[in-house]
Amino acid sequence: MNALDSHIGGVVIMGHRGTGKSTAVRALADLLPSKNRVRGCLFNCDPDQERELCDNCKMDLQKGLTLEREPFQVPVVELPLGATEDRVCGSLDLEKALTQQIKVFEPGLLARAHRGFLYIDEVNLLEDFLVDLLLDAAASGWNQVEREGISVNHPANFVLVGSGNPEEGELRPQLLDRFGLFVRVTTVSNLDDRVKIVGNRDHFERDPYTFFSKMNSAQKDLQKKLKRALKRVTSVKVSQEVIRKIAELCVRLQVDGHRGELTISRAARALAAWKGHESVNESDVRRVTVMSLQHRLRKDPLEQFESSDQIKKILDQVFPLVTK
């Protein structure tokens, strides 16, 4: 859904070790269609969005130059836990400074992730200063760097994706609230599914080329479906009745702010586009509500029920299941 609408706000995936969280995120890169950027731009600037150009591209426009375009693969950039501030935000290119006596800015991970995905494995173990950097960039959509006499301002709009094991620590509330969706992944308990997983992994390790050939057709089908959904998503309609019920749901659950309603409506629209529908129905809303709200509810230490159970209870009242 985030691949269809980046405004959903990303996703955090929490679950036990070895459940395929990281594998699923890294596999996303091969599904994403290419985009256009300004030729040679280190910040992946969109030539059709003049208000979101880096300083270099703005200077070229002011000089009357035409911003040529080139296709590029949508990036899925991984942010390691031990990354430094310079690695994330960018820094002075020391090699050129020493050998050529010129000051050149070397883009960081935020620049590489612009118009793509920024992935953090074990996000709940992320250092506090990195969390603050991400919160600033996520809030403004820009990264401003002041280094050794260099001042650089460039766009940093990315979809934030995190994964982690809840047993290793909790995620800071400020960062958790920035994620649009929250997904729990559990270990597969069905015997046939476990056998299939082991068989696929064994096949891949023994003969990866044959395995890729076997899965190529299904992969191509997913790519085509994603492209069709991308063309359709902006035209999918959400009726006032559905929006009113979404708002009622959030009011009854005492959700703070309005990110809950916005996330549900955007995620439901993306899901409807994926299904090939022209408008959002109540089934779409039911499908995305728990993952949109379960990390936003106020926590009561005396409450014995899971947040997801509380959401489902109110959801059944506002959006009752229609049985035929």
Task: Label the model's feature ranges.
Residues 1-4, 263-273:
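Contiguous, well-ordered alpha-helical segments that form the cores/surfaces of helical PPI scaffolds
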Residues 1-189:
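Conserved ASCE/P-loop NTPase catalytic core
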Residues 9, 143, 203, 274, ...:
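Conserved hydrophobic residue
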Residues 17, 23, 247-259, 270-324:
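C-terminal engagement/docking regions of AAA+ P-loop ATPases
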Residues 22, 132, 173, 177, ...:
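Non-catalytic, well-ordered alpha-helical scaffold segments
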Residues 31, 35, 201-205, 291-295:
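Phosphate/oxyanion-binding loops and surfaces in catalytic or ligand/nucleic-acid-binding neighborhoods
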Residues 87-89, 171-230:
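Conserved AAA+ ATPase core "coupling" helix
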Residues 209-264:
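Conserved AAA+ ATPase small/helical "lid" subdomain
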